[in-house]
A protein has these predicted regions:
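Flexible, low-complexity segments enriched for small/polar residues
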Residues: 40, 44, 48-75, 83-229
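Conserved active-site loop region of the serine DD-peptidase/beta-lactamase
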Residues: 80
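Non-catalytic, conformational "gating/processing" segments within enzyme and secreted inhibitor domains
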Residues: 1-58
Length: 229
């Protein structure tokens, strides 16, 4: 028990939460309340829905939520069991292109594709591979982890990321690094498009028909199929 409990700030007396009255010692009441909330069926459903929305689909099927919720209840919330249930739900119920990539994951996917180090400044000419520059890019992309909105954190919904402003930020970032970073790495957007979309497909031809190297990179990395998983 690593909980610190301040008796000075505690409101004395009995406390009733969700129809149950807690009469124990103040610090024990807190632990008892937390355990009851964790065991409540509504808690497992809430957690299961949020996990399914993050990994399966913005509007996940009821079966996916129930699979995760059942694992939570059966194991008492054991993380390893719940995580395995999430994987099973993804395998069984997710479809290709169901989830839109948040900026952070999209950024990592871009640099994984070009096999390049992370990353250049979002604005500027100097190479700098330390943490602050990565934070600068994530901030410009609108997804700096330490600035997540409260109380719900970053949204898992595509509608919150698919806005003109947020798309413009991604376009500008690809436009910047394509001029030097991608060329230096020997990255070929047309070959990558053939591998990702299928040689001869409409999407691959769309990338191949780009008038410039920069434009080809933008068409590839800002293509709907690249930005979804």
């Amino acid at each position: 028990n690593n909980t610190y409990f301040s008796h000075k700030g505690n409101e004395p007396g009995h406390h009733t939460v969700m129809g149950k009255t807690y009469k124990q010692d103040p610090s024990k009441k807190l632990l008892s309340l937390c355990k009851d909330l964790a065991r409540d069926p509504k808690t497992s459903l809430h957690i299961a829905k949020r996990l399914a929305q993050h990994f399966v689909a913005d509007d996940p099927p009821r079966e996916a939520i129930e699979l995760i919720s059942h694992a939570y209840n059966r194991s008492g919330g054991t993380l390893a069991v719940v995580h395995q249930a999430v994987i099973d739900a993804v395998v069984k119920f997710s479809r290709e292109d169901d989830k839109f990539l948040q900026p952070e994951i999209w950024l990592f996917q871009v640099h994984k594709a070009i096999q390049g180090e992370l990353p250049l400044k979002f604005v500027g000419d100097t190479d700098d591979h330390n943490g602050p520059q990565l934070n600068s890019i994530l901030s410009e992309l609108g997804h700096l982890n330490c600035r997540s909105p409260q109380p719900n954190g970053w949204s898992d919904m595509a509608i919150d990321w698919l806005t003109p402003e947020m798309m413009d930020r991604r376009l500008r970032y690809i436009g910047q690094i394509s001029n030097r970073k991608m060329r230096e790495s020997g990255f070929d957007p047309k070959k990558y498009a053939d591998m990702l979309f299928g040689a001869g497909s409409n999407s691959a031809q769309f990338v191949a028909s780009a008038p410039t190297y920069r434009n080809a990179c933008i068409r590839l990395f800002c293509h709907p199929k690249f930005m979804r998983t």
